[in-house]
C-alpha cells in the first residue's frame, strides 16, 4: 500500500496549487510549455552557425540558471531550499558529470557504443529515417532514448547488483536543479547509456531531441511549484511524479521510472500521480560524498560475504 511507511499525497486533486495573483498563476502554469515550444522553434530555425553542440551547452546552462532562480521565487517546499552545504555537494557532482563521466562515455559508454554500431551498419540503410520530417526524427530519437532509460531505471530497482549503485541517488533528501547529477559514478554512467550518439549523423535532429529532453526532463529534480496543464502532466514526468519516486515510502519508489515521458509508465502500469515532501532512505539519513563513492562496493562485499559465508558454513551431507 502506497503511503504505509511515509506520508505521500496521491491524486492531482490533492496536490496544492500555486498561490498568488493572476500574473503569477499564469507564469507558473504556462512556463513549461512556453519554454518547450520556444526552444524547439529556436533550434528548428537557427542558422547552421548557431546550431552547434557548444551553443546547446550554454543554452542548457542558462536554462538551469533560470530554474535555479525560480526555486527562490516559488519553492515547492521550504524544507527543500538550497543550502550552501547542499550546493557545494551538488557542484562536485556536476563537475564530475562534465569531466570524468563525459570521458568515460566517450571511450567506453554510449558514444563508444554508437561508433561500434555505425561501424557495422551503412548509413544508407537509414535513408528511410533521414527522409522523415525533422521534428519526427527528433521525437523518435527522444522516445528511443527515454524508453531505454525507463527499462534501465526499472532494472535498477529490480536487480540487486544494479540497485547497489543506484541506491545512493535515493539517499538525497531534497530535490533541486542539480540533484539529477548526484549519485555514485557507476550508476550515473549506467543511466546515461543509450544510443543517442548513434544519431550524430543527424545533428539538427539530435539537437532538437536534446531540447526535448532539456525542457521536459529537467523538471524531475527541481524545487518549484507549477500548475502544470493536464496534458503536460499526462505526457511528461513532473517534479510531483519524481518526488513520489524518491519518497521514504518503499511502495512509492516502485513507480514513475521514466526520465521524461511519464506516459511510458502509464503504458506499463507503473505510474502514480502524486507527490511527497519527505525524501530519502533510512529515515532521511544524509550520505557524505565519501560514503556515496564507496557504498555500492562495501555493501556488495558484505552481501557476497554473507551469501558465500553462509554456504560454506552449511554441514556436508
In which residue ranges do the predicted regions lie?
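N-terminal membrane topogenic signal
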Residues: 16-34
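Hydrophobic core of alpha-helical transmembrane segments in multi-pass integral membrane proteins
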Residues: 31-44, 62-68
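Short, hydrophobic transmembrane alpha-helix segments
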Residues: 41-54
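Loop-to-helix transition at the N-terminal end of transmembrane alpha-helices
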Residues: 51-66, 85-90
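Transmembrane alpha-helical segments that serve as helix-helix packing and pore/cofactor-lining elements
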Residues: 69-90
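Membrane-embedded catalytic scaffold of the fatty acid hydroxylase/desaturase
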Residues: 92-282
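A membrane-cytosol interface segment of integral membrane proteins
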Residues: 278-317
